[in-house]
Amino acid sequence: SKWMPNSEDVMGWNVKNSGLHVVFSKSIPVIISKWLGPFIHEFLNRYDLHPAQIENFVAHPGGKKVLQAYEEALQLTTEHTTISRDILKAHGNMSSPTVLYVLEQFMLKRNEPNTYGLLVALGPGFSGEAVLLEWRE
């Protein structure tokens, strides 16, 4: 888990009498491109891993530009983000639960044993969450 200081205006919710109103800054893809790489490298270093060892990238698909920013920041191919793109196309950005729809599709497909996956979601405040996954026999 990592939070970016002074980023309350990047992503979140405004609570008004008329209900919840989402806050999405247009700078999110640029922030991801610069901020996500160091965060994920630091996270993977704790496990003596590097991004090239990640077979399955389970990403919350905030939007097409967000997925492109993931690819740029972590040197991923579009193959890594295909399932996230498919979920985005079928359901849109459903907020927090969206990454669980992506995870479900990874769990349903045949994965090679003894491979690693990385679940990544971004959220309000601007924050990032990462979970290391391992597929076993």
Question: What is each residue range found by the language model?
Answer:
Residues 33, 37, 51, 55-137:
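Claisen-condensing/thiolase-fold acyl-transfer catalytic domains that form or cleave C-C bonds
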Residues 1-34, 38-42, 122, 134-137:
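Condensing-enzyme catalytic core mediating Claisen C-C bond formation in acyl metabolism
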Residues 25-26, 47, 63:
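Short, structured coil/loop segments at alpha-helix boundaries
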Residues 17, 42-46, 53, 73-75:
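Membrane-interfacial loop- and helix-cap regions that link adjacent transmembrane helices
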